[in-house]
């Protein structure tokens, strides 16, 4: 199990360094910038998987996590059902998915509705537009 997590962490760190991140949102109130790597999109019949990077202006903390400056996640979007779920997330000590991985979670979340007027809605639109194109 530890070996698998190490391999996943190294793969994410390596892909972060080589990824071509495109900024899709900046929220000055929250101090976040959200990026998407369109080269990582994986399409199936009705879902799209996409890599997302959330970069923070200030270090973030949660009750059970060490401080982190960015989160690299893979999300899956159901275009017809307007739902989404997080498949994987890695929390990084530095901006843009760099630095030590302070925490990772590879347990897929349950499907949930994409909230209206949210960054997740914008991400869903980007993902599903890519599905419709091809």
List the model feature ranges, each with a label.
Residues 4-13:
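Sec-dependent N-terminal signal peptides
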Residues 17-134:
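N-terminal secretory-pathway/extracellular module detecting exported/lumenal segments
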């Amino acid at each position: 199990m530890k070996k698998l997590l190490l391999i996943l962490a190294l793969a994410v760190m390596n892909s972060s360094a080589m990824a071509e991140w495109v900024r899709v949102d900046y929220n000055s109130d929250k101090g976040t910038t959200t990026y998407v790597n369109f080269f990582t999109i994986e399409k199936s019949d009705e879902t799209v998987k996409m890599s997302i990077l959330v970069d923070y202006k200030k270090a973030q903390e949660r009750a059970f996590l060490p401080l982190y400056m960015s989160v690299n996640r893979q999300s899956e979007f159901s275009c017809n059902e307007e739902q989404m779920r997080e498949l994987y997330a890695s929390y990084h000590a530095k901006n843009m998915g760099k630095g030590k991985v302070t925490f990772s979670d590879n347990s897929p979340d349950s499907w949930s509705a994409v909230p209206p007027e949210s960054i997740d809605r914008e991400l869903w639109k980007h993902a599903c537009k890519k599905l419709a194109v091809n």
